[in-house]
Amino acid sequence: MIRIVPACMFLSLALAASGPAAAITRTYYLAAEETLWDYAPSYPINPMHNGKFTADEKVFVAGDQRTRIGHRYYKARYVEYTDASFTTPKARPPEWQHLGLLGPVLRANVGDTLKVVLKNKTKRMPVSLHPHGLLYHKDSEGVPYADGSAGQDKGDDIVPPGGVYTYTWEVPERAGPGPGDPSSIVWLYHSHVNEVVDTNTGLVGPIIVSRPGELKDDGHLKGIDREFVVLFAVFDENKSFYLDKNIAAFAPAAARRTEDPEFMESNRKHSMNGYLYSNLPGLTMKEGENVRWYQLALGTEVDLHTPHWHGNTLMEAGRRLDVLNLLPGTHLTVDMQPDNPGIWMYHCHVNDHIDAGMMAHYTVLPRHP
């Protein structure tokens, strides 16, 4: 007797044989390091209008030794290294140059495990690592508080200057894209010893989690031509670990003005990835490409952001839009297929944030030059 085997059974057997993408452990080596950061390297020119900064704009970028620090500040950031010796920084690929102040992208598929070896290379600042969204146990939370843990479970709380600690984070299904999400989503990681101080000092970065099988061997997503990660944040330098050092270096006469409202306002940097007034580089794509944007926010009550792209539209969970809503600590993933070549404005639509420089350009090159 000849049995007829349905074609769907062959397909099922083939899929079972191939199986899902194998879960792996991905290891990253990050160092927290002091850096001299420039919020507006184009100064004295504002790239948004290609003219000199106006008097109102100079409040946020011009230093004068007496009343304002300016556009350069000592900060801390996460820097990726090639191995546990922490001797050779890993070069940031051109496609991620737009990350600016942010730490490196940590990638994982659902089912993977992330091991992040953190070395504190600052001289005085205690640091840690805390992820959003992922599964971690008490020895890898990265937050010091009265949680009933003890012994080895407290080693993650604080990494002192010169110290090294390995954080282990799992990526279960509940940390990955949901039913209505695209093939990848984004989470934040940041230092959490003193979250307000640590994040305003600059210790923050992105985690991108994709569905199994969506990440190619070269580290790029299937079906996506370009990815951009942008953090909208008013970095409050008044609350930075390095405030005193910045005053001493760039505005020594302002040492007695730390409670002055005008001085404090000049230290609030309305930034996109740590850049003001269209200094954010690298947001370039081609007409018709599949472009994924990961949008992040951190901060306080002033960090209510509405990212807006001129010239093109995006899709979020089946909805067409050109403006998003971001609250502090939120993460959004949206897709764009640009059909309108040109150099376009990309900014927060909150008026006060526009005035203070929370804006950038993105460029869509024509499909056929």
Tell me what each language-model feature is.
Residues 6-16:
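Bacterial N-terminal signal peptides
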Residues 22-369:
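Copper-binding active sites and cupredoxin-like electron-transfer domains
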Residues 1-3:
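N-terminal secretory signal peptides that target proteins for export/translocation
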